């Protein structure tokens, strides 16, 4: 069954096949598909940023995640039953020459897995993009769907794992399989990135691991995560400052553990570090 895209009105199947005109979809019908962790590593090794975006968006390396993301896309949450679900991996998105890189955990089953854009279509994204708008990184305060006119300047958002995982918990093997996409994307962004904001302890650990693999000096013992935690990581040219933030999950925002001001302060600090 094909259903109309909420922004463009074009009809799509769920999951969305590549090359059908979904907003911001860089994949085509002949984009190479990774079916194993070794495939991911091979395809990511010398890919451009656009190629990472395209190839990672059709990845099928992790059977459990493929099954879950596509099952969710087929069954759909009742409130979204009339629209198509992306149902594919959600690639990094934003400024290709960003001074600030935001690292999250994974897309939400009815958020990024539905809309095709990271942190888009759920409460966490509502908080994140509103904060990015208040701090000058986004041209509008909302992110509802790919194609909605949102643009980021000076910042890019990536996920540690690109598929929505059951219970928001990827396995270590799934994290490791996806890490080659993350390593390549971060490596391509590193010439411009001065600040990395990790949303939650999982992203903090992943960011340290990725940066270490890319040649950035990581202190021992490893710096501990905390909201507002900050560590300067030396590299051959300049340094990268890693900044921790509580994840803007409903668990944190509803309870007041994370407030709008706390999130704004993190991005204001990141902007200052990056000179944005």
Where are these regions (language model features)?
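A polyanion-binding, active-site-adjacent surface
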Residues: 4-233, 238-275
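The feature marks either
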Residues: 1
């Amino acid at each position: 069954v094909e259903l109309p895209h909420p922004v463009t009105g074009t009809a799509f199947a769920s999951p969305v096949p590549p090359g059908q005109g979904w907003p911001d979809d860089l994949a085509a019908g002949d984009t190479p598909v990774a079916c194993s962790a070794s495939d991911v590593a091979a395809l990511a090794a010398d890919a451009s940023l656009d190629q990472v975006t395209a190839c990672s968006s059709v990845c099928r390396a992790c059977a459990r995640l493929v099954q879950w993301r596509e099952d969710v896309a087929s069954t759909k949450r009742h409130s979204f039953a009339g629209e198509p679900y992306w149902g594919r991996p959600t690639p990094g998105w934003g400024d290709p020459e960003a001074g600030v890189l935001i690292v999250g955990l994974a897309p939400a089953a009815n958020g990024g897995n539905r809309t095709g854009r990271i942190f888009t279509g759920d409460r966490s994204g509502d908080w994140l993009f509103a904060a990015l708008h208040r701090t000058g990184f986004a041209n509008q305060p909302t992110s509802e769907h790919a194609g909605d006119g949102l643009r980021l300047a000076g910042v890019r958002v990536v996920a540690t794992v690109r598929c929505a995982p059951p219970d928001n918990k990827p396995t270590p093997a799934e994290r490791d399989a996806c890490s080659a996409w993350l390593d390549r994307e971060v490596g391509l962004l590193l010439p411009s990135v001065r600040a990395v904001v990790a949303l939650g302890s999982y992203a903090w650990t992943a960011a340290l691991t990725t940066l270490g693999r890319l040649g950035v000096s990581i202190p021992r013992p490893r710096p501990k995560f905390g909201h507002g935690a900050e560590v300067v990581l030396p590299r051959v040219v300049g340094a990268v400052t890693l900044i921790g933030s509580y994840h803007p999950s409903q668990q944190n925002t509803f309870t007041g553990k994370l407030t709008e001001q706390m999130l704004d302060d993190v991005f204001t600090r990141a902007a200052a570090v990056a000179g944005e």
